[in-house]
């Protein structure tokens, strides 16, 4: 610990980059504890041999990823970071540059598929870093000297159903439900189910879309803080499961791992809804740093980088 305390800024930067590179690569190889547990629960609930075989293939894939030290899905996604950083965290000014360097290193050590294509030029950068990518979402925490960072790998399949729109106010919450069902029944089968469905409700599309993605960061089993919101989550989850999309879209007892709603106060004349989905290989991971750049992995119990 004393050595960490006495590190100069460049040593802190290099330590942070190294940890985040390893953690980003790790995210592509191991599902978070809650997702792994939920898949086991869903497998038990299946009544058909085909559905059980699909789940068994998923677990075999996870086993091989561990044994071979390789990503669990060939599509390692576009890297996104959701950063909650204290105003007194020593590297607050360096985080963006450090994360870009971490992605370059993670691409090599993962290895991660090259998924950053520059718009208009249609050129793959070859290192998963490009204009505004990795995407970094910021939350500033006053009077804190710690940082908490979520890593999210946004694959092509699970990003496909993503959408947002502003509803007419008279459509109300039933309009929200219809919007979600129309999108999942149209595109959910192609997004590698069972899905985690994130819904954002707000007054404008950009806020609703952002909240829908943040809803995917919540641990499975958590509920919206408002009882009415929690009830709507349960209603939508039950309805989507009744469609029986099943694992891999091949039919089964469940379509989703869960439904999470996040909301912001809205304008009286508008109700905007955003939708994001996570596939069965929901690669979402969380890590916390103290001011000495020592880390704790939150999402994967006992993980050591």
Enumerate the predicted regions with their spans.
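Non-transmembrane, aqueous-exposed alpha-helical and coiled segments at domain scale
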Residues: 2-199, 204-305
């Amino acid at each position: 610990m004393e050595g960490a305390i006495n590190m100069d800024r460049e040593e802190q930067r290099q330590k942070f980059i190294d940890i985040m590179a390893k953690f980003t690569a790790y995210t592509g190889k191991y599902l978070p504890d809650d997702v792994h547990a939920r898949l086991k629960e869903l497998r038990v609930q299946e009544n058909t041999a085909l559905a059980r075989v699909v789940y068994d293939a998923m677990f075999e894939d996870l086993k091989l990823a561990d044994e071979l030290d390789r990503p669990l899905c060939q599509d390692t996604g576009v890297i996104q970071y959701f950063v909650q950083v204290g105003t007194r965290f020593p590297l607050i000014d360096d985080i963006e540059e450090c994360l870009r360097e971490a992605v370059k290193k993670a691409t090599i050590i993962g290895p991660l598929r090259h998924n950053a294509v520059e718009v208009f030029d249609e050129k793959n950068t070859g290192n998963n870093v490009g204009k505004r990518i990795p995407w970094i979402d910021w939350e500033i925490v006053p009077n804190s000297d710690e940082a908490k960072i979520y890593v999210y790998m946004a694959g092509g399949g699970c990003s496909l159903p993503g959408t947002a729109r502003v509803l007419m106010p008279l459509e109300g919450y039933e309009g929200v439900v219809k919007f979600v069902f129309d999108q999942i029944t149209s595109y959910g089968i192609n997004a590698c189910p069972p899905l985690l469905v994130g819904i954002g409700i707000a007054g404008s599309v950009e806020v609703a879309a952002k909240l829908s993605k943040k809803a995917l960061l919540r641990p499975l089993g958590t509920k919206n803080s408002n009882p009415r919101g929690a009830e709507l989550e349960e209603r939508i989850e039950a309805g989507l499961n009744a469609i029986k999309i099943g694992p891999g879209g091949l039919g089964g007892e469940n379509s989703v791992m869960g439904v999470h709603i996040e909301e912001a106060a809205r304008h009286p004349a508008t109700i905007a809804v955003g939708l994001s989905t996570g596939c069965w290989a929901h690669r979402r991971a969380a890590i916390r740093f103290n001011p000495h750049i020592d880390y704790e992995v939150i999402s994967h119990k006992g993980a050591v980088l």
